[in-house]
Swiss-Prot record:
Entries under InterPro entries matching the protein: Peptidase_S1_PA, Peptidase_S1_PA_chymotrypsin, Peptidase_S1A, Trypsin_dom, TRYPSIN_HIS, TRYPSIN_SER
Catalytic site positions: 65, 110, 204
Signal sequence annotation: 1-18
GO CC terms, sorted: extracellular region; secretory granule
Pfam families linked to this entry: Trypsin
Protein's UniProt name: Snake venom serine protease KN12
The organism of origin for this protein: Trimeresurus stejnegeri (Chinese green tree viper)
Amino acid sequence: MVLIRVLANLLILQLSYAQRSSELVIGGDECNINEHRFLVALYKSGRFRCGGTLINQEWVLTAAHCDRRNMEIKLGMHSKNVPNEDEQRRVPKEKFFCDSNKNYTQWNKDIMLIRLNSPVNNSTHIAPLSLPSNPPIVGSVCRIMGWGTITSPNETYPDVPHCANINLFNYTVCHGAHAGLPATSRTLCAGVLEGGKDTCKGDSGGPLICNGQFQGFVSWGGDPCAQPREPGVYTKVFDHLDWIQNIIAGNTTATCPL
């Protein structure tokens, strides 16, 4: 009887460990509820679509490929099913793209700036994330987060955002890993070379925070996600600072860097 109990306990421990490990395959562990006050969720027709980043009380930065008609933006959200008491909702008042025709590629101009229909108030779970003051440094440890699938290729979408730490690589690593990428690009390359941690479907537009600075946001990556030697590609915020700041200042004819 004692032996049976010991074996049963070992089995429970094994299953518990396996479950925790599977949760780390794509998006990491559940984010601390207080670490993502700037993270927003983009919805279309009641369905979660993408992430984004609040950069001041009236503006959100995300990926151009996340654009949809009749979008709703949720701020201060942690659980999709259990709202925070200070959760707020907005819709876009205006959307801005690098190209008036919304032309973008996997390596260029996948960026959208959204002006909210009314400003949001800072609260327990809502606060903007500052734009970067310095360029990103290769070798940095970066934080990723989002409500995207935590398994791939089969998709499992969590109720709460997951967070993980990954590394910032030289762009040449992504250039060698993904066919079709040009020799240079205004994107960042980040991931874990041994695989197992990555952003994935549903994480698009969510932030890449390196050494505490908002350096990028999710653009695209390999399929399946989190494969060895296939880091993800992130739009580089620092290269678009002038365009972002000009648009916010009212210069809506500003152009993105070539």
